[in-house]
Amino acid sequence: MKKILFAAAVMALFTVNANAQFGFGAPQQQSGEPKAPELEYVVRLNVTLGQAFTVGDTGKGTRTVIPITGGTFEGPDIKGEVLPGGADYQMQCDGRTEIEAIYCIRTDDGVSIHVRNCGIIKMGGQGGMYFRCAPKFEAPKDSKYSWMNECLFLCQPGFGAGGGITLDVWKVK
């Protein structure tokens, strides 16, 4: 019994310490209608793409690879270029496409940031389409962009000029 009480006390102390260390407050009781999270606009990426090629039916769906050949990006506090060499890896099955784009960007002040953007494309009725993604950014921890490592982002892709893609990215506040 003493071991159980000791373990409970240690867990309580750890929880209090973690809450203080990471800025978590006590869980708040939810009342009334749920409140949607706020979004803050971060950046628009204009990505140029190469010729897509199909790997074929893998048993999980049809794998297509679309090379990322470059591009630019700009937002209120960040701008630069999309580096060539990444790709958008797509898996299509039953009218639904899962995407995973992996590439790097370089800011105009010389900081390289890794991007991994996962999302879903689903064709709807009457020509509608659901196309949303959740990019993750990995910036150097000693850079002014390190805040990007600690945030959740959502993006709304669109088709750009010349067969490219445009990604508008928001931070979830």
Predicted regions and their residues:
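Bacterial Sec-dependent N-terminal signal peptides
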Residues: 1-24
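Beta-strand-enriched cores of mature, soluble protein domains
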Residues: 22-173
